[in-house]
Amino acid sequence: MNTSPGAPTGVRAFVDSQPIGRRQRIIVLMVFLIMVADGMDITLASHLFPPVIRDWGVPVSAVTLVVSLGVVAMAIGALVSGPVADRWGRKGVTVVGFVLFCLATAGLGLTGDIHSFAALRIISCFGLGAVMPVALTIVADWMPKARRAQMVSIAFAGVGVGSIIGAYLAAAVIPTLGWQVMVLIAGLAPLIILPFFVALVPEPAIISVRRGIPEARIRSALALVAPDRDIAGVDLTRAGLTLGAGEVRAKALFAEILCRPLLGVTLLIWGVFFVVQGSGLLVLQYMPMLLQAPAPGLSTVESGLIVAMYGWGALIGQLTIAFILKRFDRFIALAAFIFWSVVGLLIVAAFGTGFGFFGYFTLLFAIGLSLPATAAAMQSVTTLAYEEEFRATGMGSAGFAGRLGTLTYGALGGTLIGAGFGITTVSLVLAAPLAVSIGLVFSLRALSRRAGIAPEPHQITPGNEVDDAHVST
């Protein structure tokens, strides 16, 4: 690609033309570590509330309300953070959200009643909800289109690592030191990441151009990503942001993702996120209880080992799909992983009460390979659906839909178990909307192709990045 002053290149075309370098790998690593903190919170929260109920003598209904308010706060955080990040920058939103999450989580260990506990938990969840979509958007903004889906999925795999670490941390700390020490560790330890993130992760160049940041600072950021390339010919004026159909118009950012040709795409993304994240939450949150029910009647230790194996399956599946997305149609890969999840759940529904420990051990590992990986794939699908100018808004709105899914499925799981239904019925109820979501994925594929949105990563070659980005030079 010519980067001489006589042939100006748009920012996106310049990033797309670069192979992934050392600084981009560092960016992925930093966001991966932030996702680890997110995954730790998911697991630790499930271990946190039983001792809170025991120590303070609060009713289960009060804790249920705290959990529900926390999920709502996550959803609002995701929804609000996207437009703010699109207008004022990704990096600052990520840092503020992460600090809120860490400090509020650590503060839980200093509370003495359910009211102050609930207030801090809501703040913590708001920060956490804001961080995930914006941090993943930073990864997407700095990656070439051909590798964007893969790198976003690898960064998201940190959630799986965090869930495993959280489970072991809870098992080691709570029985000996108490839940207060556990939340102090979970809140303060991730802050170690922050100075490295601030120092090593530059603000995405395209957002800096939109904000009118001095060109010298933007060129410095581009030089970090592509130290061996001449960046003098990169167009850092607003004219260089014109990405064809993705050009931002003078209207609200939410209107951008809800107008044609993106309306149908956005609604389908919301639908799949709702089902996928809700299903994953229900399995993680209620599987120990279902396994310890009279049928199948497993012990606490056995159910714990099975859920841990589900976590390992999740990690392997998320890393696996990251490399699959580099080579194959992302929609086909996503549909295949959802289908595998449906098959596993239907096997449990059909023969669940007849399985012993090893049967569930194997099945839950298999479901872990597929179901959590669909969430990673959806993050990648979403980053490729939206241009940089409103990508964080699209990611945040998808995160909002996913959090609403976790809230709905959490209530559904509690209702089913409270009504006396066991693992076979719950698995069948889970399988049905997942099967429907396969149809949503293929509809999303058709709409995306019709609208000419984000060609498949494997279709992009080094000679056609500029054309794919629709950059005017």
Swiss-Prot record:
GO terms for cellular component: plasma membrane. Residues 1-25, 81-91, 143-153, 202-263, 326-330, 376-398, 445-473 are cytoplasmic. It comes from the Bacteria. It is a multi-pass membrane protein. Keywords: Cell membrane, Membrane, Transmembrane, Transmembrane helix, Transport. Residues 47-59, 113-121, 175-180, 285-304, 352-354, 419-421 are extracellular. Pfam families: MFS_1. The keyword Membrane applies. InterPro entries: MFS, MFS_dom, MFS_trans_sf, Sugar_transporter_CS. One of its GO terms (molecular function) is carboxylic acid transmembrane transporter activity. It is found in: Cell membrane. The chain crosses the membrane at residues 26-46, 60-80, 92-112, 122-142, 154-174, 181-201, 264-284, 305-325, 331-351, 355-375, 399-418, 422-444. Signal peptide: none annotated. SUPFAM superfamilies: MFS general substrate transporter. Belongs to the major facilitator superfamily. Aromatic acid:H(+) symporter (AAHS) (TC 2.A.1.15) family. Probably involved in the transport of 1-hydroxy-2-naphthoate. This is Probable 1-hydroxy-2-naphthoate transporter. The lineage of its organism: Bacteria, Bacillati, Actinomycetota, Actinomycetes, Propionibacteriales.
